[in-house]
Swiss-Prot record:
Complex formation: F-type ATPases have 2 components, CF(1) - the catalytic core - and CF(0) - the membrane proton channel. CF(1) has five subunits: alpha(3), beta(3), gamma(1), delta(1), epsilon(1). CF(0) has three main subunits: a, b and c.
Major place of residence: plastid
Function: Produces ATP from ADP in the presence of a proton gradient across the membrane.
SUPFAM superfamilies registered for this protein in UniProt: Epsilon subunit of F1F0-ATP synthase N-terminal domain
Keyword presence, Ribonucleoprotein: no
Name used for this protein in its record: ATP synthase epsilon chain, chloroplastic
Organism whose genome encodes this protein: Cyanidioschyzon merolae (strain NIES-3377 / 10D)
Annotated localization: Plastid, Chloroplast thylakoid membrane
GO cellular component, one term: chloroplast thylakoid membrane
InterPro entries: ATP_synth_F1_dsu/esu, ATP_synth_F1_dsu/esu_N, ATPsynth_dsu/esu_N
Listed NCBIfam families: ATP_synt_epsi
Family: Belongs to the ATPase epsilon chain family.
Keywords associated with the record: ATP synthesis, CF(1), Chloroplast, Hydrogen ion transport, Ion transport, Membrane, Plastid, Thylakoid, Transport
GO molecular function: ATP binding; mRNA binding; proton-transporting ATP synthase activity, rotational mechanism
Gene field: atpE
Amino acid sequence: MKMKIITPDGYVWDREIEEVILPSSTGQLGILAHHAPLLTALDIGVMRAKTAQGWVALVLFGGFAEVLNNQITILVNGAQEAHEIDLQHAQQEEAKALEQLQQAATPTAQIEARQNLAKWRARVQAVSFQI
């Protein structure tokens, strides 16, 4: 089946896949070929896609996914392939984000810190999946 990932900056991914596991707002969602039509919200998290070459991990920064006519279209705020991520840097940023969350004084600061922490944790998880 065909999968496209689109961010505000344009196409990030346009490939044939065999299977995908998405970080939906209700938990992990697995999709195989000929899946029923579906529209779902996506959380910040790791997407795993099985291509002819094997499994690939990408970090998605929240958005929506549509499954229709054996094609998956993913619209997200941002995306990053695991092979582009420096694990040591991501772990350092995750620790900083956790510290920022602990020091957040206002509800708005807490929300922003939680989102930042989720992004860095997803990056660490994506790289760990690829190893």
